[in-house]
Amino acid sequence: MSEATVNDNAAVKNEKGARKVRSGYVVSTKMNKTIVVELEDRKQHALYGKIMRRNSRVKVHDENETAGVGDRVRIEETRPLSKDKHFRLTEVIEKAR
């Protein structure tokens, strides 16, 4: 087995286990150690080509409760922390005014 094949197999394992990193805006902080972040997906319509926006809301674990409503945050996928929480807060990119 060549060295290149071994390196390719290692690269595939790393990509498979990579965590999703997203950014969005905080819309709610009413729960303890949990924030609700709104994420925006942009997709092009298959037939007409128009760029369409779709928003989704996810619950995010905020251990130190540092984020506030309106803040732009970066979140990272993690193991399931509860029924709905699968993300954790990585950093606050921009504070709300």
Curated annotation (Swiss-Prot):
KW ATP-binding (keyword) present: no
Region (Disordered): 1-20
Gene Ontology biological process terms in this record: translation
Short name of one Pfam family: Ribosomal_S17
UniProt keyword terms in alphabetical order: Ribonucleoprotein, Ribosomal protein, RNA-binding, rRNA-binding
Superkingdom of the organism of origin: Bacteria
Family annotation (InterPro entries): NA-bd_OB-fold, Ribosomal_uS17, Ribosomal_uS17_bact/chlr, Ribosomal_uS17_CS
Family of this protein: Belongs to the universal ribosomal protein uS17 family.
Protein name: Small ribosomal subunit protein uS17
Organism in which the protein naturally occurs: Corynebacterium jeikeium (strain K411)
Lineage: Bacteria, Bacillati, Actinomycetota, Actinomycetes, Mycobacteriales
